[in-house]
Amino acid sequence: MAFVGEAPADYEVIDGRPLVGPSGWRFDKLLKLADIDRAACLVTNVVDVQAPDNDIDKLLVSKADAAPGLPMVRSGKYLPLDLVPQLDRLRDEIVKCAPNVVVTMGAFAVWAFYGPAA
């Protein structure tokens, strides 16, 4: 299994891994309830940089400044060119792990796999 969040927050930046701190504690509790071994899963984020104020919208840019060829993330917001390598990293992690299930957690994670919401 692979679990894909959006971006690291304060605790994740300090620890250097996704889903630690308060959100990670809840995540671990839910995994335990479902009898899922976290160590057997890929746990990652769409991007490995922290968004200002932990607000994904603050990582995004206008269409004029967007990476060419990528769909809108949300209304009027696009991925900047400097974050495109993050999508490549995410793809490589997923390919290497070859999970039978990918759980996207958050709208940005859904976008990374499926594009903008219909």
List the model feature ranges, each with a label:
Residues 1-118:
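A polyanion-binding, active-site-adjacent surface
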